[in-house]
């Protein structure tokens, strides 16, 4: 059976268009708020509203998928995000945008949960790593192209909203030509997210998603600040961030394939060790290009491998709930990690960015090394 079936390819095609729209809005909304002379705290609160929507969307989507299936859940999520886009143009103001960014956050999280769950349910224990690697590649390529679009087109609010909303709705079109089957058995009771978070045999995967959120959130949010404080120009900062993200894109497929072939525990151990090495290299002022490349290649691929690990440990009908738990764990890590690291950097040294990344990675490595490798055989394999 082919890994990249027609439903999978069409799903990823639609996701690419949605990711473009999401990346453009996430970049421009803070700038539009600043142009409206809103204070820094107001910009921060609007951003928090979006992430709060992410959390709510993550919690709701499992129920929606069980009720109406993957296809219609995907359509609904896309329409919710499109409404969040278009709503920004109806009334410009703090409270209005607070509400619309919350709506967009709900839609965005629903899209991620639907797509990730559909891919995991479509795959097996032998190819799930490659499926999630393809998903992450589409995500990062879409984010990169979205940033490129921002630099090439008009960034005026009323110029951007029509085509961004159009992109979101166009993301629905590929799935009109296929049906992604929801293979959760109807006679199974709903699985709670809490039970997935407490599942002992999947704990390494859950912890891996939290660590991944801390690492990626810190790199995305604080790496530009670190480089700026080192005297790097804005143009060069863009170049070094491109190196970091490009490494993440290039690492997805080979690492996903290695995880499928040699086992996810071994690959996770190597990945985390490489993240620690990359962090030490940055602290030692070694050649920045190779240091950032190995940091990006290993750090940006932690999430899909940890997710695939956790999904091996549950029954097939529990995959959607497990995906919700993993996305929730990642979101919590990406929210708390940068906040704590930023406080350390402000009060002590910018080098705390890489000390923090190396420290949490080392803790996770100890967890991985404690696992003797005689875990139960994967059960979510059909």
UniProtKB/Swiss-Prot annotation:
InterPro entries: MFS, MFS_dom, MFS_trans_sf, MFS_YcaD, MFS_YcaD-like
Cytoplasmic side: 1-13, 66-78, 123-130, 178-203, 256-269, 312-324, 369-382
Keyword set, alphabetical order: Cell inner membrane, Cell membrane, Membrane, Transmembrane, Transmembrane helix, Transport
Record topological domains on the Periplasmic side: 35-44, 100-101, 152-156, 225-234, 346-347
TM spans (from-to): 14-34, 45-65, 79-99, 102-122, 131-151, 157-177, 204-224, 235-255, 270-290, 291-311, 325-345, 348-368
A single MF term (Gene Ontology): transmembrane transporter activity
Major subcellular site: membrane
Record's subcellular location: Cell inner membrane
Annotated Gene Ontology cellular component terms: plasma membrane
Xref: Pfam families: MFS_1
Membrane topology: Multi-pass membrane protein
Highest taxon above the source species: Bacteria
Family the UniProt entry places it in: Belongs to the major facilitator superfamily. YcaD (TC 2.A.1.26) family.
NCBIfam families the record matches: PRK03633.1
HAMAP family xref list: MFS_YcaD
Protein name: Uncharacterized MFS-type transporter YcaD
Species this protein is from: Escherichia coli (strain K12)
Upper lineage: Bacteria, Pseudomonadati, Pseudomonadota, Gammaproteobacteria, Enterobacterales
Name of the encoding gene: ycaD
